[in-house]
Amino acid sequence: MAFVPVTGAIAGATAAAAYVDAKFHITKDIRGIRGQKAAARALEKNSQGKGQSLWYQFETQVRRLPSTEECIWSRTGCYTWAETYANACRYGQYLHQNGVVPGQLFAMYMMNRPEFLFTHLGGWSIGSAPAWINYNLAGDALVHCLKVSEAKVLIVDEDQECRQRIEDVRERLEGELGMTILVLDNALKGEISRTEPKRPEDELRVGMKGKFPLFLFYTSGTTGHPKACPFETQRAAGLTGRVGAMGLKPGPNGDRWYVCMPLYHGTGGTTALVCMVTGLTCCIGTKFSTSKFWSDVRDSRSTAMVYVGETARYLLNAPPSDLDRKHNIRAMFGNGLRPDVWQRFVDRFGIEVVGEFFNSTEGVMALFNGSRGPFTATSVGHQGFIDRWRFHNTYVPVEIDFATGDLVRDPKTGFCKRKSYKDGGEILVQMPSESAFVGYWNNPDATEKRFERNVFKKGDLWYRTGDALRRDADGRWFFMDRLGDTFRWKSENVSTAEVSEALGSFPGIQEANVYGVEVPGHDGRAGCAALYIDPAHRDSFDFNALLAHVKAKLPKYAVPVFLRVQKQQTTMHNNKQNKVPLRNDGIDLRKLMERADKEAKEQGKEEAEYDTMYWNPAALGAGKGKTDGDSYVVYTMADWDLLKGSKDVEGGAKL
């Protein structure tokens, strides 16, 4: 009967192992590590020794899937895998015949449509890769992005507004940059469609490996213009691994991923490419629309969706409907899903899996949370014991001076102060060498600024993420704040320096100090500009002319929603602009007046001078009863009270 205690011992050991696994999430970590290795092996296998180009991954899916299986769905046209492959070959030939050569980039200024993917895949087919240009950009910022890319060929969307923005700078693009501009209108699309879909030779793709980019995309910084980041070919396994982590199934009859985020944007564009190289159907939405979102999802038979934080809030703000669960979406993938939105969205729309990720555009730090329940809800990443051990001295929180943005260093040792993961701080990432960070494309100065040296010991090298996060005892990572000047609005990064430059070029403005402010009922921060206007121009200053001026120079999401006209210029001791008190005041006029009263008292003044604030209600969907359209009007305490009271009303701040 000795087997009885043995059986009991086995049962006890099994229970103990299950407890340890549940507490420390060992299996989850091992599954993640194996998944990444499997993705890397698949890339190597599908290339068949011909190189690392993801073109071969795409071809593998084309061969594997039935020719009648749908590859791309859109309102403007649907395409099977065979049709998509033929079009990619045609576009590759056209690009090659018109100056795009292997090993060099070309540029795409295109909206969400199947031709975006035909063009991108066509570039891969000939050993090239695209620079994704934000189609909202105009003027100097647009020229800057194209110049940085060093592309000599620009593919332009047929949309009339896109074409006009290019026409406005055509002379500079052709003269200064030597670019060939090709507008993908109906005539050109017809010409390309009539060519024979001949497969480009393998020799064209031999250079697509290692650090050669799969694409170039842009991030707003504090230098005034977007910075370009290459997504290296050697990072491809990180892309394809997300499919398994989300529990998605490739075709035939597999999952269908709805993407209405801009394809020039990292989240939207990479998801579309993942579909192409893993065998999922990509369902393309022209742009995000609360009213059209679910009809697109239902008509496309999508089973997964892409989001940014604001997307979920906007959809949640729509009135409840009997159709809320009449869809096939079971998984959603993206970033920035706010804690106050997360569970309400999941419960209302019946979502099974939320794939929330945190990643710097530069690709230095990556976290992922495949949440299937309340335990990991609201976290941007989750690490079990193994991953916590692996990254303990790689992802490190440090103390920062929030007023200056500088790392806090010990006055005696000169080294930084490490924070506990529980308390959190700005996350630094240890770098084995400078070459480990791919850096910004053709911008070594900006690359150098992301490094921090001698952090914990002499000679060490770290990358500053510019983001504050914390991690709890269960391995869940939570986003705390975005540090520095750049802020997010309408799911885009807004560069304060770029906005300041646009404002400063308007007659009468002597100084523009730009920062982001929180608005009740809205994700991110809206742009606010503290202006010091030349006294000679104050009485005749035209605020609506200013609005027209900045709208012509900036993307729509970067145009300031609020203006604060200052009585006095405010600088720090070193003549740098001081954003901290302005940001703390926000748009609450009571706080603004309280601080002014306090400062007047400290300075012995009998009466305080108050700044005047203006706003554009239409930019928040709050124009009803205020104005007939876009315009800056005086902002009052009553407006603030209404904004606070409307945060739970449909559509955010709708007055």
Residue ranges and their predicted role:
Residues 2-38, 97-98, 121, 125-193, ...:
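Structural core segment of the AMP-binding/adenylate-forming
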Residues 80-82, 205-207, 214-238:
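Conserved AMP-binding A3 loop
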